[in-house]
Amino acid sequence: MQCALYDAGRCRSCQWITQPIPEQLSAKTADLKNLLADFPVEEWCAPVSGPEQGFRNKAKMVVSGSVEKPLLGMLHRDGTPEDLCDCPLYPASFAPVFAALKPFIARAGLTPYNVARKRGELKYILLTESQSDGGMMLRFVLRSDTKLAQLRKALPWLHEQLPQLKVITVNIQPVHMAIMEGETEIYLTEHQALAERFNDVPLWIRPQSFFQTNPAVASQLYATARDWVRQLPVTHMWDLFCGVGGFGLHCATPDMQLTGIEIAPEAIACAKQSAAELGLTCLQFQALDSTQFATAQGEVPELVLVNPPRRGIGKPLCDYLSTMAPCFIIYSSCNAQTMAKDIRELPGYRIERVQLFDMFPHTAHYEVLTLQVKI
Protein backbone atom coordinates (compact mmCIF):
# COMPACT_ATOMS: atom_id res chain seq x y z
CA MET A 1 0.00 0.00 0.00
CA GLN A 2 1.34 3.43 -0.94
CA CYS A 3 0.94 6.10 1.75
CA ALA A 4 2.18 9.67 1.37
CA LEU A 5 1.88 10.22 5.13
CA TYR A 6 4.22 7.30 5.84
CA ASP A 7 6.63 8.24 3.06
CA ALA A 8 6.90 11.76 4.47
CA GLY A 9 7.56 10.43 7.98
CA ARG A 10 4.37 12.03 9.28
CA CYS A 11 2.69 8.82 10.50
CA ARG A 12 4.12 5.49 11.61
CA SER A 13 0.94 3.71 12.73
CA CYS A 14 1.23 1.11 9.94
CA GLN A 15 4.62 -0.24 10.95
CA TRP A 16 4.58 -3.13 8.44
CA ILE A 17 3.45 -1.05 5.45
CA THR A 18 6.67 -1.71 3.49
CA GLN A 19 6.11 -5.49 3.61
CA PRO A 20 3.91 -7.15 0.96
CA ILE A 21 0.71 -8.66 2.38
CA PRO A 22 1.87 -12.30 1.83
CA GLU A 23 4.96 -11.56 3.95
CA GLN A 24 2.81 -9.96 6.64
CA LEU A 25 0.56 -13.03 6.72
CA SER A 26 3.56 -15.36 6.95
CA ALA A 27 4.99 -13.39 9.87
CA LYS A 28 1.65 -13.36 11.70
CA THR A 29 1.14 -17.09 11.12
CA ALA A 30 4.64 -17.80 12.44
CA ASP A 31 3.89 -15.71 15.54
CA LEU A 32 0.64 -17.58 16.17
CA LYS A 33 2.24 -21.00 15.68
CA ASN A 34 5.01 -20.02 18.07
CA LEU A 35 2.48 -18.98 20.73
CA LEU A 36 0.62 -22.29 20.34
CA ALA A 37 3.77 -24.42 19.99
CA ASP A 38 3.08 -26.27 23.26
CA PHE A 39 -0.39 -27.36 22.13
CA PRO A 40 -1.05 -29.94 19.40
CA VAL A 41 -3.33 -28.44 16.73
CA GLU A 42 -5.23 -30.89 14.54
CA GLU A 43 -5.96 -28.48 11.68
CA TRP A 44 -4.40 -25.17 10.66
CA CYS A 45 -6.85 -23.44 8.30
CA ALA A 46 -5.54 -21.01 5.67
CA PRO A 47 -5.39 -17.40 6.92
CA VAL A 48 -8.12 -15.00 5.79
CA SER A 49 -7.31 -11.52 4.51
CA GLY A 50 -9.20 -8.66 2.88
CA PRO A 51 -8.43 -5.40 1.06
CA GLU A 52 -5.12 -3.78 2.01
CA GLN A 53 -6.49 -0.22 1.86
CA GLY A 54 -9.82 1.58 2.19
CA PHE A 55 -11.08 -1.16 4.51
CA ARG A 56 -11.75 0.72 7.75
CA ASN A 57 -15.35 1.56 8.61
CA LYS A 58 -14.39 3.89 11.45
CA ALA A 59 -12.25 7.00 11.93
CA LYS A 60 -11.20 8.25 15.36
CA MET A 61 -9.88 11.75 14.78
CA VAL A 62 -8.23 13.98 17.37
CA VAL A 63 -9.28 17.57 16.64
CA SER A 64 -6.52 20.17 16.93
CA GLY A 65 -5.46 23.40 15.25
CA SER A 66 -7.76 26.42 15.40
CA VAL A 67 -11.50 26.84 15.03
CA GLU A 68 -10.92 28.50 11.63
CA LYS A 69 -8.42 25.85 10.47
CA PRO A 70 -9.03 22.62 12.37
CA LEU A 71 -6.88 19.54 11.87
CA LEU A 72 -8.39 16.05 12.07
CA GLY A 73 -6.00 13.26 12.90
CA MET A 74 -3.64 12.65 15.80
CA LEU A 75 -1.11 14.23 18.11
CA HIS A 76 2.51 13.12 18.04
CA ARG A 77 4.15 12.30 21.36
CA ASP A 78 5.58 15.80 21.57
CA GLY A 79 2.08 17.26 21.10
CA THR A 80 2.54 18.23 17.45
CA PRO A 81 -0.75 17.79 15.53
CA GLU A 82 -0.98 15.75 12.34
CA ASP A 83 -3.88 15.82 9.86
CA LEU A 84 -4.76 12.28 8.72
CA CYS A 85 -7.72 12.96 6.43
CA ASP A 86 -5.74 11.45 3.53
CA CYS A 87 -5.00 8.17 5.36
CA PRO A 88 -5.43 5.39 2.75
CA LEU A 89 -6.96 3.03 5.32
CA TYR A 90 -10.17 5.07 5.07
CA PRO A 91 -12.60 4.50 2.18
CA ALA A 92 -13.03 7.24 -0.43
CA SER A 93 -16.46 8.03 1.04
CA PHE A 94 -14.81 9.54 4.14
CA ALA A 95 -13.06 12.36 2.23
CA PRO A 96 -16.17 14.51 1.55
CA VAL A 97 -17.24 14.10 5.19
CA PHE A 98 -13.90 15.34 6.50
CA ALA A 99 -13.99 18.18 3.95
CA ALA A 100 -17.44 19.33 5.15
CA LEU A 101 -16.64 18.94 8.84
CA LYS A 102 -13.79 21.44 8.79
CA PRO A 103 -15.94 24.46 7.81
CA PHE A 104 -18.74 23.13 10.03
CA ILE A 105 -16.45 23.27 13.06
CA ALA A 106 -15.94 26.98 12.31
CA ARG A 107 -19.67 27.56 11.69
CA ALA A 108 -20.58 25.96 15.02
CA GLY A 109 -17.74 27.66 16.89
CA LEU A 110 -16.37 24.37 18.17
CA THR A 111 -12.94 25.42 19.39
CA PRO A 112 -10.54 22.45 19.22
CA TYR A 113 -9.36 21.28 22.63
CA ASN A 114 -5.76 22.27 23.36
CA VAL A 115 -4.20 19.55 25.52
CA ALA A 116 -1.26 21.66 26.71
CA ARG A 117 -3.43 24.62 27.73
CA LYS A 118 -6.43 22.54 28.85
CA ARG A 119 -8.67 24.90 26.89
CA GLY A 120 -11.20 24.44 24.10
CA GLU A 121 -14.23 22.20 23.60
CA LEU A 122 -13.99 19.78 20.66
CA LYS A 123 -11.75 16.81 21.51
CA TYR A 124 -12.54 14.09 18.97
CA ILE A 125 -14.63 13.34 15.92
CA LEU A 126 -15.72 9.71 15.59
CA LEU A 127 -17.10 8.60 12.22
CA THR A 128 -18.54 5.16 11.41
CA GLU A 129 -19.89 3.96 8.06
CA SER A 130 -22.32 1.14 7.31
CA GLN A 131 -21.20 -1.11 4.46
CA SER A 132 -24.77 -2.15 3.74
CA ASP A 133 -26.24 1.23 2.73
CA GLY A 134 -23.47 3.83 3.13
CA GLY A 135 -25.20 5.47 6.10
CA MET A 136 -22.93 7.10 8.65
CA MET A 137 -22.80 7.80 12.38
CA LEU A 138 -21.00 10.96 13.52
CA ARG A 139 -20.08 11.68 17.13
CA PHE A 140 -18.68 14.97 18.43
CA VAL A 141 -16.73 14.42 21.66
CA LEU A 142 -16.87 17.68 23.64
CA ARG A 143 -15.41 18.74 26.97
CA SER A 144 -18.78 20.14 28.10
CA ASP A 145 -22.24 21.02 26.80
CA THR A 146 -21.32 24.74 26.54
CA LYS A 147 -21.38 24.71 22.72
CA LEU A 148 -24.33 22.34 22.37
CA ALA A 149 -26.85 25.05 21.39
CA GLN A 150 -24.49 26.46 18.75
CA LEU A 151 -23.90 22.99 17.35
CA ARG A 152 -27.64 22.31 17.11
CA LYS A 153 -28.19 25.63 15.35
CA ALA A 154 -25.53 24.86 12.72
CA LEU A 155 -26.68 21.27 12.17
CA PRO A 156 -29.14 21.89 9.27
CA TRP A 157 -26.21 23.05 7.11
CA LEU A 158 -24.31 19.85 7.87
CA HIS A 159 -27.35 17.69 7.04
CA GLU A 160 -27.68 19.53 3.75
CA GLN A 161 -24.04 18.87 2.88
CA LEU A 162 -24.00 15.27 4.14
CA PRO A 163 -27.40 13.55 3.89
CA GLN A 164 -25.66 10.20 4.53
CA LEU A 165 -25.33 11.14 8.22
CA LYS A 166 -28.07 9.02 9.80
CA VAL A 167 -26.98 9.25 13.45
CA ILE A 168 -25.36 12.33 15.01
CA THR A 169 -24.53 12.63 18.70
CA VAL A 170 -22.56 14.69 21.16
CA ASN A 171 -20.54 12.81 23.76
CA ILE A 172 -19.42 14.69 26.85
CA GLN A 173 -15.91 13.81 28.03
CA PRO A 174 -14.95 16.35 30.73
CA VAL A 175 -11.75 14.70 31.99
CA HIS A 176 -8.30 15.97 30.97
CA MET A 177 -7.07 12.52 29.97
CA ALA A 178 -6.61 10.58 26.72
CA ILE A 179 -10.02 8.94 27.08
CA MET A 180 -12.00 8.65 23.87
CA GLU A 181 -15.50 9.10 25.29
CA GLY A 182 -17.46 9.91 28.43
CA GLU A 183 -20.66 8.42 29.82
CA THR A 184 -23.11 11.09 28.59
CA GLU A 185 -24.39 10.71 25.01
CA ILE A 186 -26.76 13.33 23.57
CA TYR A 187 -28.61 12.37 20.37
CA LEU A 188 -29.12 15.08 17.78
CA THR A 189 -31.01 12.89 15.29
CA GLU A 190 -34.15 10.78 15.42
CA HIS A 191 -32.19 7.63 14.59
CA GLN A 192 -30.05 6.30 17.42
CA ALA A 193 -28.47 3.29 15.68
CA LEU A 194 -26.75 2.65 12.36
CA ALA A 195 -28.00 -0.31 10.32
CA GLU A 196 -25.39 -2.80 9.11
CA ARG A 197 -25.64 -6.21 7.47
CA PHE A 198 -23.12 -9.08 7.35
CA ASN A 199 -23.95 -12.33 5.53
CA ASP A 200 -27.68 -11.46 5.48
CA VAL A 201 -27.64 -10.98 9.27
CA PRO A 202 -28.92 -7.54 10.37
CA LEU A 203 -26.61 -5.83 12.85
CA TRP A 204 -26.86 -2.46 14.56
CA ILE A 205 -24.17 -0.01 15.64
CA ARG A 206 -24.87 2.42 18.46
CA PRO A 207 -22.58 4.91 20.19
CA GLN A 208 -20.55 3.25 22.94
CA SER A 209 -20.98 -0.23 21.47
CA PHE A 210 -17.94 -2.07 20.10
CA PHE A 211 -18.01 -3.02 16.43
CA GLN A 212 -15.22 -4.51 14.31
CA THR A 213 -13.41 -1.93 12.17
CA ASN A 214 -12.69 -4.20 9.17
CA PRO A 215 -16.08 -5.31 7.78
CA ALA A 216 -14.68 -7.42 4.92
CA VAL A 217 -12.70 -9.64 7.28
CA ALA A 218 -15.17 -9.47 10.19
CA SER A 219 -17.97 -10.83 7.99
CA GLN A 220 -15.73 -13.79 7.09
CA LEU A 221 -14.88 -14.30 10.77
CA TYR A 222 -18.56 -14.50 11.73
CA ALA A 223 -19.37 -16.75 8.77
CA THR A 224 -16.55 -19.11 9.73
CA ALA A 225 -17.78 -19.35 13.33
CA ARG A 226 -21.26 -20.09 11.98
CA ASP A 227 -19.91 -22.88 9.77
CA TRP A 228 -17.94 -24.42 12.63
CA VAL A 229 -20.95 -24.37 14.95
CA ARG A 230 -23.22 -25.94 12.32
CA GLN A 231 -20.87 -28.95 12.26
CA LEU A 232 -21.28 -29.53 16.01
CA PRO A 233 -24.12 -31.28 17.88
CA VAL A 234 -25.19 -28.11 19.70
CA THR A 235 -28.67 -27.12 20.87
CA HIS A 236 -27.63 -24.62 23.55
CA MET A 237 -24.74 -22.14 23.57
CA TRP A 238 -23.41 -19.09 25.37
CA ASP A 239 -21.94 -16.10 23.53
CA LEU A 240 -19.78 -14.36 26.16
CA PHE A 241 -18.37 -10.84 25.62
CA CYS A 242 -20.91 -10.80 22.77
CA GLY A 243 -20.82 -7.11 21.82
CA VAL A 244 -23.66 -6.35 19.39
CA GLY A 245 -24.23 -10.10 18.96
CA GLY A 246 -22.29 -10.71 15.74
CA PHE A 247 -21.21 -14.24 16.62
CA GLY A 248 -24.39 -15.39 18.33
CA LEU A 249 -26.71 -14.01 15.65
CA HIS A 250 -24.70 -15.83 12.96
CA CYS A 251 -24.51 -19.12 14.86
CA ALA A 252 -28.07 -19.32 16.15
CA THR A 253 -30.74 -21.45 14.51
CA PRO A 254 -34.49 -21.10 15.13
CA ASP A 255 -34.51 -24.04 17.56
CA MET A 256 -31.21 -23.28 19.31
CA GLN A 257 -31.17 -21.79 22.78
CA LEU A 258 -28.57 -19.03 23.02
CA THR A 259 -27.61 -16.59 25.76
CA GLY A 260 -25.44 -13.59 24.86
CA ILE A 261 -23.70 -11.63 27.62
CA GLU A 262 -22.02 -8.24 27.27
CA ILE A 263 -21.37 -5.58 29.91
CA ALA A 264 -22.23 -2.62 27.62
CA PRO A 265 -26.00 -1.90 27.62
CA GLU A 266 -25.82 -0.08 24.26
CA ALA A 267 -24.38 -3.18 22.59
CA ILE A 268 -27.06 -5.41 24.14
CA ALA A 269 -29.76 -3.07 22.81
CA CYS A 270 -28.30 -3.63 19.31
CA ALA A 271 -28.23 -7.41 19.75
CA LYS A 272 -31.84 -7.52 20.94
CA GLN A 273 -32.97 -5.42 17.97
CA SER A 274 -31.24 -7.81 15.54
CA ALA A 275 -32.69 -10.91 17.20
CA ALA A 276 -36.20 -9.42 16.97
CA GLU A 277 -35.71 -8.69 13.26
CA LEU A 278 -34.59 -12.26 12.64
CA GLY A 279 -37.54 -13.66 14.61
CA LEU A 280 -35.22 -15.68 16.83
CA THR A 281 -37.25 -16.15 20.00
CA CYS A 282 -34.84 -18.54 21.76
CA LEU A 283 -32.11 -15.89 22.00
CA GLN A 284 -31.50 -14.00 25.23
CA PHE A 285 -29.14 -11.04 25.48
CA GLN A 286 -28.27 -9.53 28.85
CA ALA A 287 -26.08 -6.59 29.92
CA LEU A 288 -23.92 -8.29 32.54
CA ASP A 289 -20.29 -9.03 33.32
CA SER A 290 -19.50 -12.20 31.34
CA THR A 291 -17.32 -13.81 34.03
CA GLN A 292 -19.78 -13.04 36.83
CA PHE A 293 -22.69 -14.38 34.76
CA ALA A 294 -20.94 -17.62 33.82
CA THR A 295 -19.50 -18.47 37.22
CA ALA A 296 -22.92 -18.00 38.85
CA GLN A 297 -24.49 -20.72 36.67
CA GLY A 298 -24.89 -24.28 37.96
CA GLU A 299 -24.69 -25.83 34.52
CA VAL A 300 -23.25 -25.02 31.12
CA PRO A 301 -24.46 -25.50 27.52
CA GLU A 302 -22.70 -27.78 25.02
CA LEU A 303 -20.84 -24.80 23.51
CA VAL A 304 -19.34 -21.68 25.05
CA LEU A 305 -18.13 -19.04 22.57
CA VAL A 306 -15.89 -16.30 23.99
CA ASN A 307 -14.73 -13.11 22.28
CA PRO A 308 -12.94 -11.19 25.05
CA PRO A 309 -11.07 -7.88 24.90
CA ARG A 310 -7.28 -7.92 24.65
CA ARG A 311 -6.81 -9.00 28.26
CA GLY A 312 -8.36 -12.42 27.54
CA ILE A 313 -10.97 -14.28 29.58
CA GLY A 314 -8.76 -14.62 32.69
CA LYS A 315 -8.13 -17.37 35.22
CA PRO A 316 -11.49 -17.29 37.09
CA LEU A 317 -13.46 -17.99 33.90
CA CYS A 318 -10.87 -20.55 32.73
CA ASP A 319 -11.15 -22.36 36.07
CA TYR A 320 -14.94 -22.36 35.85
CA LEU A 321 -14.92 -23.73 32.29
CA SER A 322 -12.40 -26.40 33.28
CA THR A 323 -14.65 -27.48 36.15
CA MET A 324 -17.96 -27.36 34.27
CA ALA A 325 -16.40 -28.78 31.08
CA PRO A 326 -18.68 -27.80 28.17
CA CYS A 327 -18.19 -30.09 25.16
CA PHE A 328 -16.84 -27.29 22.97
CA ILE A 329 -15.20 -23.88 23.38
CA ILE A 330 -14.81 -21.47 20.47
CA TYR A 331 -12.34 -18.73 21.33
CA SER A 332 -12.12 -15.59 19.18
CA SER A 333 -9.19 -13.40 20.16
CA CYS A 334 -7.60 -10.11 19.12
CA ASN A 335 -4.57 -10.91 21.29
CA ALA A 336 -3.10 -14.36 20.71
CA GLN A 337 -0.71 -13.95 23.66
CA THR A 338 -3.51 -13.79 26.23
CA MET A 339 -5.44 -16.48 24.33
CA ALA A 340 -2.47 -18.85 24.59
CA LYS A 341 -2.23 -18.07 28.30
CA ASP A 342 -5.94 -18.87 28.73
CA ILE A 343 -5.65 -22.10 26.72
CA ARG A 344 -2.91 -23.21 29.11
CA GLU A 345 -5.50 -22.91 31.89
CA LEU A 346 -7.85 -25.28 29.99
CA PRO A 347 -5.90 -28.57 30.12
CA GLY A 348 -8.98 -30.72 29.58
CA TYR A 349 -9.31 -29.58 25.95
CA ARG A 350 -7.57 -30.28 22.68
CA ILE A 351 -7.33 -27.74 19.86
CA GLU A 352 -9.15 -29.08 16.84
CA ARG A 353 -8.93 -26.07 14.55
CA VAL A 354 -7.19 -22.69 14.31
CA GLN A 355 -7.64 -19.92 11.75
CA LEU A 356 -6.00 -16.50 11.52
CA PHE A 357 -7.97 -13.47 10.30
CA ASP A 358 -5.93 -10.47 9.13
CA MET A 359 -8.20 -7.84 10.64
CA PHE A 360 -5.40 -5.27 10.99
CA PRO A 361 -3.20 -5.16 7.85
CA HIS A 362 0.19 -3.40 8.00
CA THR A 363 0.48 -4.03 11.76
CA ALA A 364 1.56 -6.99 13.90
CA HIS A 365 -2.00 -7.45 15.17
CA TYR A 366 -4.47 -10.07 13.98
CA GLU A 367 -7.63 -11.92 15.02
CA VAL A 368 -7.65 -15.67 15.59
CA LEU A 369 -10.44 -18.24 15.92
CA THR A 370 -9.88 -21.57 17.70
CA LEU A 371 -12.13 -24.57 18.26
CA GLN A 372 -11.38 -26.54 21.43
CA VAL A 373 -12.95 -29.92 22.11
CA LYS A 374 -13.25 -31.61 25.50
CA ILE A 375 -10.86 -34.55 25.80
Swiss-Prot record:
Residue positions of the active site: C334 (nucleophile)
Q: What Gene3D superfamilies does this protein's entry cite? A: 2.40.50.1070, Vaccinia Virus protein VP39
Stored InterPro entries: 23SrRNA_MeTrfase_RlmC, MeTrfase_TrmA_AS, MeTrfase_TrmA_CS, SAM-dependent_MTases_sf, U5_MeTrfase_fam
List residues binding [4Fe-4S] cluster: C3, C11, C14, C87
Which keywords appear in this protein's UniProt record, sorted alphabetically?
4Fe-4S, Iron, Iron-sulfur, Metal-binding, Methyltransferase, rRNA processing, S-adenosyl-L-methionine, Transferase
This entry's Gene Ontology molecular function terms read: 4 iron, 4 sulfur cluster binding; iron ion binding; rRNA (uridine-C5-)-methyltransferase activity
Give the enzyme's EC designation: 2.1.1.189
GO biological process terms held by the UniProt record? rRNA base methylation
Q: Where does S-adenosyl-L-methionine bind?
A: Q212, F241, E262, N307
Instruction: Please list the reactions this protein catalyses.
Output: uridine(747) in 23S rRNA + S-adenosyl-L-methionine = 5-methyluridine(747) in 23S rRNA + S-adenosyl-L-homocysteine + H(+)
Signal peptide positions are none
The reply to whether Magnesium figures as a keyword in the UniProt entry is: no
Spell out the HAMAP family in the cross-references: 23SrRNA_methyltr_RlmC
Similarity comment text for this entry: Belongs to the class I-like SAM-binding methyltransferase superfamily. RNA M5U methyltransferase family. RlmC subfamily.
- What's the stated role of this polypeptide? Catalyzes the formation of 5-methyl-uridine at position 747 (m5U747) in 23S rRNA.
Name used for this protein in its record: 23S rRNA (uracil(747)-C(5))-methyltransferase RlmC
Q: Which organism is it from?
A: Shigella dysenteriae serotype 1 (strain Sd197)
Its taxonomic placement starts with: Bacteria, Pseudomonadati, Pseudomonadota, Gammaproteobacteria, Enterobacterales
